[in-house]
Amino acid sequence: MRHQKSGRKFNRTSAHREAMFRNMAASLFKHELIKTTLPKAKELRRVAEPLITIGKVDGVANRRLAFARLRDKEAVGKLFVELGPRYATRPGGYLRILKAGFRAGDNAPMAYVELVGRPVVAEEVAE
């Protein structure tokens, strides 16, 4: 029986799942907005939010913890230099998941995952 076993499997091996969420978290920290399926977005919260909490206190030990989970120097750097200070006073809830309809090929529910309070760049209108 599968009672009290949390987390989705996504029909992948544990190594594939771990690599997928590592890559998704790194992309989220770099771009601050990604589009993925709704179940993956919900599961990504469990990976990314604790990393941002680690990023709030800069130090060698915390940087090594973050690097062990992300394996991406650029993402870890941004996590501690930019994202950690941005969320220093926020007690959790760093991500927002917005539903984005259904994918054309397989009708999978899609969602945008974005960092709360990210700076929105205004696009210039060509006249």
Swiss-Prot record:
Q: What is the source species?
A: Xanthomonas euvesicatoria pv. vesicatoria (strain 85-10) (Xanthomonas campestris pv. vesicatoria)
Please report the name of this protein according to its UniProt entry.
Large ribosomal subunit protein bL17
**Which family would the database say this protein is a member of?**
Belongs to the bacterial ribosomal protein bL17 family.
**InterPro entries, A to Z:** Ribosomal_bL17, Ribosomal_bL17_CS, Ribosomal_bL17_sf
Q: What is the lineage of its organism?
A: Bacteria, Pseudomonadati, Pseudomonadota, Gammaproteobacteria, Lysobacterales
Q: Which UniProt keywords apply?
A: Ribonucleoprotein, Ribosomal protein
Matching entries from PANTHER family are given as: LARGE RIBOSOMAL SUBUNIT PROTEIN BL17M, RIBOSOMAL PROTEIN L17
- Which gene specifies this protein's sequence? rplQ
Q: Superkingdom of this entry's organism?
A: Bacteria
Cited PROSITE patterns = RIBOSOMAL_L17
Gene Ontology terms, MF aspect: structural constituent of ribosome
